UniProtKB/Swiss-Prot annotation:
SUPFAM superfamilies reported for this sequence: Glutathione synthetase ATP-binding domain-like (SSF56059), Phosphoenolpyruvate/pyruvate domain (SSF51621), Phosphohistidine domain (SSF52009)
Modified residues (Phosphothreonine): 458
Region (Central): 406-503
Record-given protein name: Pyruvate, phosphate dikinase
Enzyme class: transferase
Active site residues of this protein: 460, 836
Region feature N-terminal, mapped onto this chain: 1-348
Length: 880
């Protein structure tokens, strides 16, 4: 077995900062600080290999470990001049702390003051001449060891402690006497014996059980949950750091604290932190005492109270930041005016702080632009783009679903798009539905937020909400709607229409009432770092957009064009939907043509508005894609209105609706199949697009950059047929306007057969755009709207590593994309490549698209900054 113990301290170290995999984050930091000659308590690190051995061998330690541990303690005794378990003078007490390879603050266990018993306590009191301190350290040990190692409920210790304080009429911890501490310690001992039938006095037995407790804590519930939330592997294991105790609770010249080298909230370049005099580290964390600031304008700061120590701490903080080239989170203890650094690690920070610090460090010539970009978590930019809930206050959620679209919104509950429109004039509304359909678009548009009982992260509600930049929570299976009573039920809570709720689309939480919100900010530094990203990345970022508002937001966030304009979204405008329904239900070609002719000028104006905003940036328009049933009326009132407008009996409307019913419409009469079977629809759309281009050119001198895209191709014959129809319309309009139209023609690759047949298809088009939503659905045979019913179980059982509709499945779907690119390029070397599914805004998937040499990705407007950073990071990683 490899070496299990590495030393660090005043005499140098066996390790260094590069050894995080075996020493853990904390151990590697201690080793590095030792090499930098910084004042740290002497100690040693037990490697992560012990943790992995422990779990592979039924929670047993290696046979040779006890000897190696004994040698390490002996070496520590020689270094410190103290004896572990000494009952005569100067005893060595230890801290035992976990240390994962990835920082997991507070998730695993720590034991302080280890090695204590009655005799050691007396020896400690004699050696330092401070019995109160010795008893306080013993009391802390019994509590921490009891709750952490022996699993005695921690509140029982707190109850004993508080009971004695009340009986003695003492309210401040600083007023506790020796006599009272002795009584508390006696009761703590009795509690140990009550739960474990013994009081463990042997320091070596304490040490072994503490080591095992830290190892067990690797798989405690909170650590498991934290790793899942942060995608940390179970296989890393934890190291264990054992150090001599240094005491911040020796009196007024001793203290403990935490300092950040810059503000973790804003990134401001000044020390930020807190400390407590006469305390140990857990006192700051527990909140039992109010800490004081490191820097302040009053006499309560460390700068004022301990100026010499403050100067030393400032120098060390600067040295550590310049050494690690990143903001540091530093824990320290002061023992009788002597400063010790207990730990340093890269500090966690808000998104705005991360950006500000990265920009500052480039300007200070500490790091490069590439390093600055790699410091930014792309997903954290959601904090800058959306309103969010202020969780600094304690809040209790009534339910939780899937975080489908980030941001927070407060409003009154409404259960229909009609009520949303009606009430939105005077109130902010939250639209609550079982699920949404394209028919709900007007209600979604006016709503401040959307909540659905069903659906997943790529359901209709989620996709549309992300495109609109609206908060959305989906798949809230612990909620139910009673449509007749118009109520939302969350356990025992009944929410009526008009009641106020708050939803958090970033966490999936739902709250009753109005919650405190934080407004988004987008600073000059944010703009600058995004500009750096564009300088570096080779993958362009476009937007999925079909309205002027979408386009304006996209340009604001740096989109280099529109990569997907879903033309059918324009049909859901209240002025157009009746005409669309007329066109679909029309019993003959003449009536259909009549409805289309009425739609033509409306569509023309829509496209003109979009081209006008985008100027000469590329606009990729997808011809009508969804099945026609999505446009059809569902309410009796709408059916009657349609019958009246067509001058047809209501019974015929019902017959037509029944005739158009499909068992599985998403794999039925949609996409290019509509264009082939009902060619007049695509012909109208193409005429509207080209007329818009011509009128802008002639009347406003605006040149458009059109890309025309055919959806749901599976067969090259489909492309050939539609291509012939498209160019027939183009030729007719060129003759009409005496104008030569210039555009590129492409297709979606969103079916496995299209990917496999891409060699033939590529000969007929200028570009492919991978529609990864449908490609994932058809590769897996899973509906993205129904995956929420089993996805949690698949993730729990590790059948899926992640949601395949959020992070691209490289092994299956990715392989089809590789095949399509290879075969497509073999017959058309100039073939352009893009991706426009939800994956196009996912950083992990963007790295794959970069590797595949795509020209662009196209995502929801509010994902554009995230995609820009992710695209740059993909390029940087490739070059490193």
């Amino acid at each position: 077995m490899n070496k299990l113990i590495y030393y660090f301290g005043n005499n140098g170290s066996d390790g260094n900062a590069s050894m995080k995999n075996i020493l853990g984050n904390k151990g590697a930091g201690l080793a590095e600080m030792s090499n930098l000659k910084l004042p740290i308590p002497n100690g040693f690190t037990i490697t992560t290999e012990l943790c992995n051995y422990f779990y592979k061998h039924n929670n047993n330690l290696p046979k040779n470990f006890q000897n190696e541990l004994q040698q390490a303690i002996t070496k520590l005794e020689i270094t410190t001049g103290k004896i572990f378990g000494s009952t005569t003078s100067n005893p060595l007490l230890l801290s035992v702390r976990s240390g994962s390879t990835v920082s997991m603050p507070g998730m695993m266990d720590t034991i302080l003051n280890l090695g204590m018993n009655n005799e050691v306590c007396n020896a400690l009191a004699d050696s330092c001449g401070n019995k109160l301190f010795a008893l306080d350290s013993y009391r802390r040990f019994l509590e921490m060891y009891g709750s952490t190692v022996l699993s005695i409920p921690s509140d029982l210790f707190e109850q004993i402690y508080e009971k004695h304080k009340v009986q003695a009429d003492i309210y401040k911890d600083s007023d506790i006497t020796v006599e009272l501490l002795e009584k508390i310690i006696d009761d703590f001992k009795r509690l140990h014996i009550k739960y474990t039938k013994q009081l463990i006095k042997d320091p070596y037995e304490q040490l072994e059980s503490a080591i095992k407790a830290v190892l067990y804590s690797w798989k405690n519930n909170r650590a498991i949950v934290y790793r899942k939330l942060n995608n940390i592997s179970e296989d890393f294991g934890t190291a264990i750091n054992i150090q001599e105790m240094v005491f911040g609770n020796l009196g007024k010249t001793s203290a403990t604290g935490v300092v950040f080298t810059r503000s973790p909230s804003t990134g401001e370049k000044k020390l930020f932190g807190e400390f407590l005099i006469n305390a140990q580290g857990e006192d700051i964390v527990s909140g039992t005492r109010t800490p004081m600031p490191i820097i302040a304008n009053d006499s309560n700061s460390m700068q004022a109270m301990m100026p010499e120590v403050f100067t030393k701490l400032s120098q060390i903080a600067k040295k550590l930041e310049e050494h690690y080239l990143d903001m540091q989170d530093i824990e320290f203890t002061i023992e009788n005016n002597k400063l010790y650094i207990l730990q340093t690690r890269t500090a966690k920070r808000t998104a705005i702080a991360a950006i500000n610090i990265a920009v500052q460090m480039v300007e200070e010539k500490l790091i490069s632009k590439e390093q600055a970009l790699m410091r930014i978590d792309p997903e954290s930019l959601n904090q800058l783009l959306h309103t969010r809930i202020d969780y600094s206050k304690k809040l209790t959620a009534i339910a939780e679903g899937l975080p489908a679209s980030p941001g927070a919104a407060t409003g009154i509950v409404v259960f229909s798009p009609y009520d949303a429109e009606k009430l939105s004039h005077h109130h902010k509304v939250i639209l609550v539905r079982h699920d949404t359909s394209p028919e709900d678009i007007n209600g979604m548009h006016v709503a401040s937020g959307i909540l659905t009982i069903r659906g997943g992260m790529t359901s209709h509600a989620a996709v549309v909400a992300r495109g609109m930049g609206k908060p959305c929570v989906c798949g809230t299976n612990n909620l139910s709607i009673d449509e007749q009573k118009q109520i939302l039920i969350a356990g025992d809570i009944v929410i009526k229409q008009g009641d106020i709720i708050t939803i958090d689309g970033g966490s999936g939480k739902i709250f009753l009432g109005e919650m405190p919100l934080i407004q988004p900010t987008f600073s000059e530094e944010s703009t600058l770092i995004l500009d750096w990203a564009d300088e570096i990345s080779s993958l362009k970022v476009r937007a999925n957009a079909e309205t002027v508002n979408d386009a304006l937001v996209s340009i604001k966030f740096g989109a280099q064009g529109i990569g997907l304009c879903r033309s059918e979204h324009m049909f859901f405008d209240k002025n157009k939907i009746p005409l669309v329904r007329e066109m679909i239900i029309a019993p003959d070609i003449e009536r259909r043509q009549c409805a289309l002719q009425k739609l033509l000028p409306l569509q023309t104006e829509d496209f003109k508005a979009l081209f006008r905003v985008m100027k000469n940036k590329p606009v990729n328009i997808r011809l009508l894609d969804p099945p026609l049933h999505e446009f059809l009326p569902t309410t009796d009132e709408d059916k009657k209105n349609l019958a009246h407008s067509l001058n047809l009996p209501l019974s015929m409307i019902h017959q037509r609706l029944h005739a158009m019913h499909e068992v599985n419409p998403m794999l039925g009469h949609r996409g290019c199949r509509l264009g082939i079977c009902l060619p007049e629809i695509y012909q109208m759309q193409i005429e509207a697009i080209l007329t818009a281009i011509f009128e802008l050119h002639k009347k406003e001198h605006i040149e458009s950059n059109l890309e025309l895209m055919i959806p749901l191709i599976s067969n090259v014959a489909e492309i050939k047929k539609l291509k012939m129809d498209i160019y027939a319309v183009v030729k007719k309009l060129e003759q009409r306007y005496s104008y030569k139209f210039s555009f590129t023609l492409g297709t979606m690759i969103e079916l496995p057969r299209a990917a496999l047949g891409s060699k033939k298809i590529a000969k007929e088009v200028d570009y492919f755009s991978f529609g990864t939503n449908d490609l994932t659905q058809t590769t897996y045979g899973i509906s993205r709207d129904d995956i929420a019913s089993f996805l949690p179980y698949y993730l729990e059982e590790k059948i899926f590593e992640s949601d395949p509709f959020t992070t691209l499945d490289e092994e299956g779907v990715g392989e089809l994309i590789k095949i399509a690119i290879k075969r497509g390029k073999s017959s058309n070397a100039n073939l352009k490549l893009g991706a426009c599914g939800e994956h196009a805004g996912n950083p992990t998937s963007i790295a794959f698209f970069h590797k595949m040499n795509l020209n662009y990705v196209s995502c929801s407007p509010y994902r554009i900054p995230i995609a820009r950073i992710a695209a740059a990071q993909a390029k940087i990683k490739q070059g490193s």
